[in-house]
């Protein structure tokens, strides 16, 4: 994604894309981060920079997975969507990085179906979390303490429910990286009633 002209922070967010990703979840978060002055990169886990969303929208990723070191990003963000979530789950580098971040208490965010990836890795065991209603059972079976809030934060793990809560997730990431005032300014800018 183009770097905002005035970066507000050195923090960066890796937005992982597999074919079948949910475009609202990925791009709404990217948009909110951009407005706040946070650099985010759309990273393709496929064999091409063109990634097709779950609704047939083609997006050009900024980078290919093999060209980045995910550990250098402040936040690892996993959008949902089907079959995109399955594509992310099947990517060994994402599994390795999510587990590394869990062990190191470094930020991970996931929305919709993607929290199920964290659950299957054991990362949500005993943690507060949320997911798309169709995946609540899966994360509960993985030990998550499930909530229906739009966004749930448990230490360094942030989860959200779906496309309709993507702006709120983006604002929560802005709050974590830049503080309440920055999140409030972006919220007003996108005319999100809070």
Where are these regions (language model features)?
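Catalytic, metal-anchored helix/loop core of enzyme active sites in primary metabolism
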Residues: 112
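Conserved catalytic-core motifs of GNAT/GCN5-like acyltransferases
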Residues: 151
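Anionic-ligand binding patches
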Residues: 129
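Short, acidic/turn-prone active-site loops that include or flank metal/cofactor-
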Residues: 133-136
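Extended, subdomain-level signal for the structured scaffold at the beginning of enzyme domains
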Residues: 1-108, 116-120, 125-126, 138-148, ...
């Amino acid at each position: 994604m183009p770097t905002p002209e005035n970066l507000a922070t050195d923090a960066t967010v890796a937005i992982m894309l597999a074919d079948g990703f949910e475009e609202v979840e990925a791009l709404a978060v990217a948009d909110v981060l951009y407005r706040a002055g946070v650099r985010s990169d759309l990273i393709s886990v496929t064999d091409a920079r063109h990634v097709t969303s779950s609704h047939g929208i083609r997006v050009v990723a900024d980078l290919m997975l093999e060209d980045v070191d995910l550990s250098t990003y402040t936040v690892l963000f996993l959008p949902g969507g089907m079959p995109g979530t399955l594509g992310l789950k099947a990517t060994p580098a994402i599994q390795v990085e999510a587990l590394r971040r869990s062990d190191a208490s470094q930020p991970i965010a996931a929305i919709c179906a993607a929290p199920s990836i964290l659950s299957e890795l054991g990362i949500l065991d005993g943690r507060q979390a949320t997911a798309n209603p169709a995946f609540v059972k899966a994360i509960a079976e993985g030990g998550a303490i499930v909530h229906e809030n739009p966004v749930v934060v448990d230490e360094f793990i942030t989860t959200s429910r779906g496309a309709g809560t993507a702006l709120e997730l983006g604002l929560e990431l802005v709050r974590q990286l830049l503080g309440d005032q920055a999140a409030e300014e972006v919220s007003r800018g996108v005319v999100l009633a809070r």
